[in-house]
Amino acid sequence: MGCNPPYHLSYRLRLLLLFTLCLTVVGWATSNYFVGAIQVIPKAKDFMASFHKVIHLGNEETLGHDGATKKPELANCPSVSPNLRGQSKLVFKPDLTLEEIEAENPKVSRGRYHPEECKALQRVAILIPHRNREKHLIYLLEHLHPFLQRQQLDYGIYIIHQTGSKKFNRAKLLNVGYLEALKEENWDCFVFHDVDLVPENDFNLYTCGDQPKHLVVGRNSTGYRLRYSKYFGGVTALSREQFLKVNGFSNNYWGWGGEDDDLRLRVELHKMKISRPKPDVGKYTMIFHTRDKGNEVNMGRMKLLQQMSRVWKTDGLSSCSYRLLSVEHNPLYANITVDFWTAA
């Protein structure tokens, strides 16, 4: 009997000590956990701050100052497009319509096109003088649009239409085209293009260089030979500065002939040299036609050529007068209609 109380006291003491020890261990583990958590929280905050900074910088690269999405800047197109095919066999469908051509060129709008895959090296305006040649125009547009697109050009096509039945003035129409096209875009290069000539080889680049370019080396109607050694007609390319330097074309060539030789003389007067592509590249098909009424041969062209050196400063872009009747933007081209009411 005397031994029982000490036994029970010792057992309870053991339980108390065991319970105290357990509390101590749990407390120690818990305190270590919270200390570690406190140390981790600042690191987590630093990580999230860095993450948000990266996201913000990424957004700055794709958003403009006004919050609008910015497209990444395109690389320049190559000087020679990888899309070129070379010589093509041209086919002219007798029942071809403008609507068919529009369907084949869905990325052309208001006569304008630019490549989406790269930044074009030049902005090129194609100027086509026109009157009563609707079928020729359709055929040219059918082939010219894909031709220029394969060259990866930023281009616009302008048809300059002379109204009325008075004598046709190709050169003055081209001066008008130059002046009016520059109201819409600061074009780098101008291609002066007859409506009845269709290029056959897309390596014949419709771009401008250090010197004026004559692109028609040969055509089917001449056996693909140059018409004469100093021929500078049909299709020519001059930069904005080159054409301005020579004061453009003369305005005084009414009817057919002489204006292209006059331009050549102006180019030579300014010590510029005419360049041409290789004969197998500068090939064109001329669509057959008879002489238009109102475009008879200019019998006074030789006299005008003789006085070019005296009058070029006052006869050209600087004196090109006309009445602008309309500027209409069709899907495939811009149509500029003018009246030369002072025509003789």
From Swiss-Prot:
Primary residence: Golgi
Pfam families linked to this entry: Glyco_transf_7C (PF02709), Glyco_transf_7N (PF13733)
Segments in the Cytoplasmic topological domain: 1-12
Positions bound to UDP-alpha-D-galactose: 129-133, 168-170, 195-196, 224, 256, 289-291
UniProt catalytic activity: N-acetyl-D-glucosamine + UDP-alpha-D-galactose = beta-D-galactosyl-(1->4)-N-acetyl-D-glucosamine + UDP + H(+); a beta-D-GlcNAc-(1->3)-beta-D-Gal-(1->4)-beta-D-Glc-(1<->1)-Cer(d18:1(4E)) + UDP-alpha-D-galactose = a neolactoside nLc4Cer(d18:1(4E)) + UDP + H(+); 3-O-{beta-D-galactosyl-(1->3)-[6-O-sulfo-N-acetyl-beta-D-glucosaminyl-(1->6)]-N-acetyl-alpha-D-galactosaminyl}-L-seryl-[protein] + UDP-alpha-D-galactose = 3-O-{beta-D-galactosyl-(1->3)-[beta-D-galactosyl-(1->4)-6-O-sulfo-N-acetyl-beta-D-glucosaminyl-(1->6)]-N-acetyl-alpha-D-galactosaminyl}-L-seryl-[protein] + UDP + H(+); 3-O-{beta-D-galactosyl-(1->3)-[6-O-sulfo-N-acetyl-beta-D-glucosaminyl-(1->6)]-N-acetyl-alpha-D-galactosaminyl}-L-threonyl-[protein] + UDP-alpha-D-galactose = 3-O-{beta-D-galactosyl-(1->3)-[beta-D-galactosyl-(1->4)-6-O-sulfo-N-acetyl-beta-D-glucosaminyl-(1->6)]-N-acetyl-alpha-D-galactosaminyl}-L-threonyl-[protein] + UDP + H(+)
Intervals, Lumenal compartment: 39-344
Organism annotation: Mus musculus
Residues with glycosylation annotation: N220, N335
Listed GO MF terms: metal ion binding; N-acetyllactosamine synthase activity; UDP-galactosyltransferase activity
Membrane topology: Single-pass type II membrane protein
Name listed for the protein in its UniProt record: Beta-1,4-galactosyltransferase 4
Any Gene Ontology biological process: keratan sulfate proteoglycan biosynthetic process
Keyword list, A-Z: Disulfide bond, Glycoprotein, Glycosyltransferase, Golgi apparatus, Lipid metabolism, Manganese, Membrane, Metal-binding, Secreted, Signal-anchor, Transferase, Transmembrane, Transmembrane helix
UniProt similarity note: Belongs to the glycosyltransferase 7 family.
Chain sites annotated for binding Mn(2+): D196, H289
EC number: 2.4.1.-, 2.4.1.275, 2.4.1.90
Pathway it works in: Protein modification; protein glycosylation; Glycolipid biosynthesis
InterPro entries referenced in this protein's UniProt entry, alphabetically: Galactosyl_T (IPR003859), Galactosyl_T_C (IPR027791), Galactosyl_T_N (IPR027995), Nucleotide-diphossugar_trans (IPR029044)
The protein's role, per its UniProt record: Galactose (Gal) transferase involved in the synthesis of terminal N-acetyllactosamine (LacNac) unit present on glycan chains of glycoproteins and glycosphingolipids. Catalyzes the transfer of Gal residue via a beta1->4 linkage from UDP-Gal to the non-reducing terminal N-acetyl glucosamine 6-O-sulfate (6-O-sulfoGlcNAc) in the linearly growing chain of both N- and O-linked keratan sulfate proteoglycans.
GO CC annotation terms, alphabetical: extracellular region; Golgi membrane
Compartment(s): Golgi apparatus membrane; Secreted
